[in-house]
Amino acid sequence: MAGKARVHELAKELGVESKTVLAKLKEMGEFVKSASSTVEAPVARRLRNAFVNNTGSPAPAAPPAATPPTPTPTPTPPRTPTPAPPPGGPRVTAKPMPPRRPGAPTPGPKPKGPVPGPPQSATPAAKPASAHDIEVAAAEARAAALKAEQEAAVKAAQAARQQQRDNVRREPPTEGGPRPGPRPGPGAMPPRPGSPAAGRSGGPTPGPGPRSGGRPPARGAGNNPFGIQGGQQRPPAAGAGGPRPSPASMPPRPSPASMPPRPSPASMPSQRPGRPGGPGSGRPGAGAGRPGGGGGGGGGYRGGGGGGGGGYRGGPGGGGGGGGGGGYRGGPGGGGGGFRGGPGGGRPGGGGRGRGGGAAGAFGRPGGRPTRGRKSKKQRRQEFDNLSAPTMSSGAPRGQGQTVRLSRGASLSDFADKINANPGSLVQEMFNLGEMVTATQSCSDDTLLLLGEHLGFVVQIVSPEDEDRELLAQFNIDLDAEVAEDRLVSRPPVVTVMGHVDHGKTKLLDAIRKANVVAGEAGGITQHIGAYQVHVPHDDQDRAITFIDTPGHEAFTAMRARGAQVTDIVILVVAADDGVMPQTIEALNHAKAADVPIVVAVNKIDKPDANPDKVRQQLTEYGLVAEEYGGDTMFVNVAAKPGTGIDSLLEAVLLTADASLELTAPTDGPAQGVAIEAHLDKGRGAVATVLVQKGTLRAGDSIVAGGAHGRVRAMLDENGNQVAEAGPSRPVLVLGLTAVPGAGDTFLAAEDDRTVRQIAEQRQARRRAAAFANSRGRATLETLMEQLKAGEKTSLNLVLKGDVSGSVEALEDALFNLDIPEEVQLRIIHRGVGSITESDVMLASASSEAVTIIGFNVRAANKVREMADREGVEIRYYTVIYQAIEEIEAALKGLLKPEYEEVELGTAEVREVFRSSKVGNISGCIVRSGLLRRNAKARLLRDGAVVADNLTIGSLKRFKDDATEVREGFECGLTLAGYNNVQVGDVIETFEMREKARV
C-alpha cells in the first residue's frame, strides 16, 4: 500500500526542484518543514493541480454535467480509466464522465437499482493525453490509494447489504442513467477476445440491450485498483487467462425472460442482462483478467464467475478489482489483485451477487447484511415507552371498600386473618410497594393504611380505649354496662383541688384535714397526687368528701388532666395577691374539657395586697362569672393559714354536688376504678393509690391495673390504717401487685388470677407492639437522612428513677419539652420507679456513651454507689423537679459546640520595610490603637482593602529585644509568618477568636 508522498518525490515527479515545491506549499498556506517531509494526499493533489495550471497543462478533468437523455439506449460504460497511449502511439480519450469515488472494488452489482437518468455519452475526446498528464494522474492515484484502502472494506460491506435490500425492492429496468464509472474506451466497439474490456467488479447493470463498447484495461496509473484511471495499457501477463469467448459466439443461456416466473417483489418483468455480456446470455466471464485490467464481467442469469483482475504491479494472475458477479444467480467474482501483488496475489474480491445473489452458508449469506434490520429511532422509542417493570402476582385478595379494624402495632399476619388471606401474599405486596416487612413484624399505622389502600380496603386503627374495651369483652367484662337503679346507692363526691403553683392548694387541704402535709413536701410544692377522704357535718349529717390534690407546677400537666378526669367537682384555687396565672388557665381548661362544675376558692385574702375583686374580674374573661355578677359560679374567699372560710368552701362544694350532680354507684359486684398514683416501696413492693368508682374492693381480690396484676394483700387509707373493704369514691393504697402500674391506668377485679394474668399479658404485648411500631416507622429517604444526621449529634443519655410513676412521667415530659438546639439530643435510655439499683448502673455502664442516672426523690444504696464509682457512672439526686430540669438543660447547652466571634486587638501602620535574607521582610510599625500581640491573628489592609487575611505575627520586637505585646503609641518591628508582600503605608490589623456564650 502506498504511503504519503514526500516533498522530494513530488518535486521529482513534477520535474522541479524541492525548494520550488516548498515555496509553492508555503504560498498555498501549508507548513512543510523540509524536503523529506510527507504531504497529505489532498495537499499533494492541490499542488499538482497548481503546477499543471502554472505550466499550462490541463488539470485532471472535472466531472461534467450529464448529457440529456436520448431516445436511443446507450450503454453504461464501465469504470473510467484514463486511457494511456499504446506502445505504438497515443490513443484518443473519450469525453470525461463523472469519475467514480476512489474506493475498493465493489464485490457485487451496484447496490441500488436502476435509476432513470440521462444516458452516458461515449464521444471520444479530440486531444490525446500527453506523457506528463499520465505521470500526474499516476501520482495522484498513488496519493488517493491510502484513503481509498481504508474505505474499501466499509464500502464493500455497505454495498453488499444495500444489494440485499435492493434485491427485494428492485424496480423494472429502465434506461440506464448515469452512474459513476471509468471513462469509455477509444470507441464504441463490441468486445473481442483478448480485448482490454473487463467486467465491472459488480453484478449486471440494468440496460435495455447489449453493451457495445469495451472498457479500457487500466483502472489507475500503475495498476492501482483505487486510483484515478489514466494508466497505460500493459500487455497481458502469462497465466492471466487467454481470450474468452465473446457473448455473440456463446450459445444463449436461459435468461429471466425464458425462465418460469419466480416470486419476487418486482415479479421479474424483464430480463436483466449480464454486464458486459450479451443480452440475457450468461458467459463464463467476458474479458480476461489482465494485469492492469479490471475483473471480468459476470454472466447473465446463471453466469460464471468473473475473471481475475490485474494488480498495480501484479504478477501473473494478479487480480485488480474483483471479477464481476454473475447475473440473477451469478457466480463468485474472481480474485482481486493487490497493490503490488505477486502471482495470483491480491485479496480476492468476492463476487457481487446479482438478483438473488449467492447461496447462504452456515454463517449467513456471504457479504450480506444482518438478517435483523436496524430499528428506527421512533420504533426504539415506542418499545422503550411500552416497557413496564415486571410485576409478580401475589394472589392477595382485592377489597371493594370493606372496612378492616386493626389494633396499633398490628402485623401482616393480623391483617391477613382479617381479610382471609395468606400472610406471605401480603409480604409480597409490601415488597412490591417498596417496603421490607416480615409477616410477624409490628407495622406502623402508615404502613397498614398504605397496604389497605393498595388492596382496596379501608383500614381503621383502633384507639387504645376501644382496644382495651375489645380485650375485656373477650373475658365477658363490660365496663360500660348499665346498672339497675335499685342497685345504685349514693356515693361521696370526688373533689380535685387545682391551681397555679404556690397558690396554697395543699395548705388549703391541710386546713380542711387539719393536718400538715406541706411540711413533708420537698421544696414546699406538691409533686404527687394525694387522695384523701374527710368527713364534714352538713345538715345534721356526716357527709364524706374525697379530695385529690394535684401538683400546680407546669411539669405536671398530665397529672392535672388525670385528676380532672376522675373528679366530680373542681376547686380552682387562685391567690388573691397574684391573680390568674398560666397554670390557673390550664387547670380551668382541664376542668372544662372534663365537663365538671367549678368552685373558685380565692385564697390568701389575709395578705395586705390581696384583691379578690380583681380575681373575679379576670376569671370573667375566661367564662367563670361569679354569682354576685349574675353568673352561676360560686366564689368563696378563704385564707388557708388562719383557716378563714373553710366551712363556707365545704358547704359550697356539697351544695354544688347536691344541686348539679346525681352521685350514685353500685356497691355490689367486682370493683372498678382508676390508679391515681403508683410507686415502688422498698419494704412493700409495688404500691398503687387507687380510687374505686364502682363495686367494692376487698382484700384478697384478684385485680389488674394496666400491665400489672396481682392479689390484694392489704389496703391502707390516707392515715396508714388497714381497710377491709373500699366502696365507691374511696381512695386506698393497694399492696400485692407484681409491677408498678402507670398513673391513670384503669383497674378492675376479676374472679381468678388466671383471668387477670391473661389480661395483663395481652395489654403488655399490645403496648410493646405499638411502641415498637412507632419507634420504627417507615424507612424512607428522609428518615434515613435524619438518622445519619442524628449519628453526628452529641447526645445526653439519662436513666430516670423516681419515687412515683407520676413524677417520673412529669420529669420525662418536661425534659422532652426543653427548647434545645438541634446540635444536641436528649436520650432517655430507661425510666423506672423505685430506688437506684445495680441493674441501672450496669445498664449505664454497658452503653457505648456516657450515661447519667437521675434519682428523683430516691437514693442509691452504698453497694450501688460503690459499683457506680467503680464503673465510672455519674449519679445525681434531685428532690425538686424544676431544679432537675434547670441542671439538665444547662448540661445540654454545655454539650453544644462552642461558637467563636472575632474580637479586634489593635492596628498598626507600616512606616518602613526592611529586607532580610534570613527572615524575609521586616515591617517597622507604630501601633495606632489597641495592642499587638505575638502569635496573634492578623490581616493586611492596603488603601482600605484587605490584601491578605488569616496571617500570624511571627516575631515581635522593640528595638533588639523580643516583646510579647506592644501597646498603642509605641514603635515595633514585626514579621508576618509566610508573607512578605508588605509596603509602606499598609495597615496591620490584629484580632483573636473568643468563645461566645450559647443562649
From Swiss-Prot:
Gene3D superfamilies recorded: 1.10.10.2480, P-loop containing nucleotide triphosphate hydrolases, Translation factors, Translation initiation factor IF- 2, domain 3
Keywords: Cytoplasm, GTP-binding, Initiation factor, Nucleotide-binding, Protein biosynthesis
Location within or outside the cell: Cytoplasm
Region (G5): 639-641
Biased composition annotated in UniProt, kind: Basic and acidic residues: 163-173
UniProt-annotated stretches for the region G1: 499-506
InterPro entries: EF-G-like_DII, IF2_II, IF2_N, P-loop_NTPase, Small_GTP-bd, T_Tr_GTP-bd_dom, TF_IF2_bacterial-like, TIF_IF2
Chief site of localization: cytoplasm
Pro residues bias locations: 60-89, 96-121, 179-194, 244-266
GO molecular function, one term: translation initiation factor activity
Pfam families to which the protein is assigned, alphabetical: EF-G_D2, GTP_EFTU, IF-2, IF2_N
Function: One of the essential components for the initiation of protein synthesis. Protects formylmethionyl-tRNA from spontaneous hydrolysis and promotes its binding to the 30S ribosomal subunits. Also involved in the hydrolysis of GTP during the formation of the 70S ribosomal complex.
Protein family per UniProt: Belongs to the TRAFAC class translation factor GTPase superfamily. Classic translation factor GTPase family. IF-2 subfamily.
The name this protein goes by in its record: Translation initiation factor IF-2
The species this protein was found in: Salinispora tropica (strain ATCC BAA-916 / DSM 44818 / JCM 13857 / NBRC 105044 / CNB-440)
Organism lineage string: Bacteria, Bacillati, Actinomycetota, Actinomycetes, Micromonosporales
